Amino acid sequence: MEDFVRQCFNPMIVELAEKAMKEYGEDLKIETNKFAAICTHLEVCFMYSDFHFINEQGESIVVELDDPNALLKHRFEIIEGRDRTMAWTVVNSICNTTGAEKPKFLPDLYDYKENRFIEIGVTRREVHIYYLEKANKIKSENTHIHIFSFTGEEMATKADYTLDEESRARIKTRLFTIRQEMANRGLWDSFRQSERGEETIEEKFEITGTMRRLADQSLPPNFSCLENFRAYVDGFEPNGCIEGKLSQMSKEVNAKIEPFLKTTPRPIKLPDGPPCFQRSKFLLMDALKLSIEDPSHEGEGIPLYDAIKCMRTFFGWKEPYIVKPHEKGINSNYLLSWKQVLAELQDIENEEKIPRTKNMKKTSQLKWALGENMAPEKVDFDNCRDISDLKQYDSDEPELRSLSSWIQNEFNKACELTDSIWIELDEIGEDVAPIEYIASMRRNYFTAEVSHCRATEYIMKGVYINTALLNASCAAMDDFQLIPMISKCRTKEGRRKTNLYGFIIKGRSHLRNDTDVVNFVSMEFSLTDPRLEPHKWEKYCVLEIGDMLLRSAIGQMSRPMFLYVRTNGTSKIKMKWGMEMRRCLLQSLQQIESMIEAESSVKEKDMTKEFFENKSEAWPIGESPKGVEEGSIGKVCRTLLAKSVFNSLYASPQLEGFSAESRKLLLVVQALRDNLEPGTFDLGGLYEAIEECLINDPWVLLNASWFNSFLTHALR
């Protein structure tokens, strides 16, 4: 039967039926007749809706496929086939917009012409018997019932068949065809006899013979027969005594359950050591942009042209010198690399026509900075078999680092609003169904809250840099290509703006595997003096390269302009994820959406509008040493987005491990707050697993610090 269903029905219908059975905990391998019945019912619901539209005059019309008028409003809203939460959201929305009475059970369709819900039935028995069962179950005059049988009979409330003769004939023909196909394969009798009434019937299912012997052999230890195991499972209390459960398990399991009380958990131990350093691929709050408004120059949109145009807006260049050396690097090479960039950009400007890309001369300073010829020679393993002391080279353990205040400042800054608009979501067509209308409304509200956010700027900057670097890595594998770090935005007044943050020079990039590394040197403009927090800039050599005139309330003032230079590296897989940083917007929108859904299910109506427009309501944002921080819904949106963006910018194995292990402790603490009396074993092992992830990563250390604040306030 399962094979027949997969051959006979559209794959989309099969997939929806699989999901429905999974949702109700039914096994389609066993309940094959039910699988076929669900697919049949879904197909009838879809056929009922197909080709039926409402025109501008409010009349119901039938329109075949490929008709230019196919953008008319659908007559029927399909509720069947959606997961329960979404289905009820649609039903609630329809009731709110049309004034229809809310049904007790989920109906299958809503008819916008007749303004009524419809329950579709497909039966293998007498239509009038099935109709009465449906009517007794629903007990509502507002839901229209329409029953079809496999023999071509039908029955509907007050003999009102809703659809025209031809549409109903299509459904009956399809049902008859399904019956014939089943009969040809010898499946029909079993299918016909398997139909139950609307009330579920419990029966004792006996297992005999070989299956019984197999069942007895397959029991867990300490169970002598299937009846004992059944009785144990039936009496299993999920929140019962854990020790009792463990005693029934294998003798190998030896765990003493300790009660988890308010006094049980201790704070996570953060490592001691020198302060942690900045390790993102580009500057965040410290970045400085050279910008042009309303770009209309020749070659606008070509990165090199845009970069040169932005560079021309600054007139305060001066002879560069080192203000904060890199402790381990040859700092003169970083200085020479910047001078080379300036000189080669000047050469481009002197040319008659500016090229689209610029490959840097392979000077000694760039070769050093990009690690050219530094990789150890690869030797085939077969040629080394005879070497007696062959071993992997020793690698040093990473040095432990302590949490530093700069990472919290970075996060706070990422949550702030800028004076530019960083995302513009394209129009995606007119909303037809209620669920689309709700989705668009939520998306628009969310976009309004985050489009000016600095975290959104980081997304667009990350997408641009990773895309440009991956393109160059594939297109110019052997070249030291100069890649401008650019972003685009709009001012509050709606004027377009192109920004230059600095430059990247890419090293050799023969990237065969996803994890093969391409080295690059980044050179980024900033007004931040590195001497204020030298530990943050451990990996950088910082030059002073000019003086910038800034307008302030007290007039013009001059500030030194710095260039942050460092050697860095990335891989194909990291660039691929960097290019997809816009996913962070989706992730944080989904988190907000789940908050709206929770609110809506309590109020039994869609609360999107109230959620975003009630400015007086304060929402919890996070934990700090002061307690639970609260803010507007806009602040919640921006904080969730910033967390998602930082998870992307500071992605690492340390973060993966900390997130997975700390979640376990979080769940236990939440169970305690919910008075569920949790018990634990090997809590020390869990702390060990969490703390081994706290090494030197600034974002992980900050998350651990937040977790400690949560523990303090949650267990008061």
From Swiss-Prot:
Binding-site positions, Mn(2+) 2: 80, 108
Cofactor(s), by name: Mn(2+)
UniProt: Mn(2+) 1 binding residues: 41, 108, 119-120
Keywords of this entry: Cap snatching, Endonuclease, Eukaryotic host gene expression shutoff by virus, Eukaryotic host transcription shutoff by virus, Host cytoplasm, Host gene expression shutoff by virus, Host nucleus, Host-virus interaction, Hydrolase, Inhibition of host RNA polymerase II by virus, Manganese, Metal-binding, Nuclease, Phosphoprotein
Enzyme class: hydrolase
Compartments where located: Host cytoplasm; Host nucleus
Superkingdom of source: Viruses
GO (cellular component) term, any one: host cell cytoplasm
Family matches, as Gene3D superfamilies: Influenza RNA-dependent RNA polymerase subunit PA, endonuclease domain
GO molecular function: endonuclease activity; metal ion binding; RNA binding
InterPro entries in the cross-refs: INFV_PA, PA/PA-X, PA/PA-X_sf
Complexes and interactors: Influenza RNA polymerase is composed of three subunits: PB1, PB2 and PA. Interacts (via C-terminus) with PB1 (via N-terminus).
Family: Belongs to the influenza viruses PA family.
Function per UniProt: Plays an essential role in viral RNA transcription and replication by forming the heterotrimeric polymerase complex together with PB1 and PB2 subunits. The complex transcribes viral mRNAs by using a unique mechanism called cap-snatching. It consists in the hijacking and cleavage of host capped pre-mRNAs. These short capped RNAs are then used as primers for viral mRNAs. The PB2 subunit is responsible for the binding of the 5' cap of cellular pre-mRNAs which are subsequently cleaved after 10-13 nucleotides by the PA subunit that carries the endonuclease activity.
Record-given protein name: Polymerase acidic protein
Gene responsible for this protein: PA
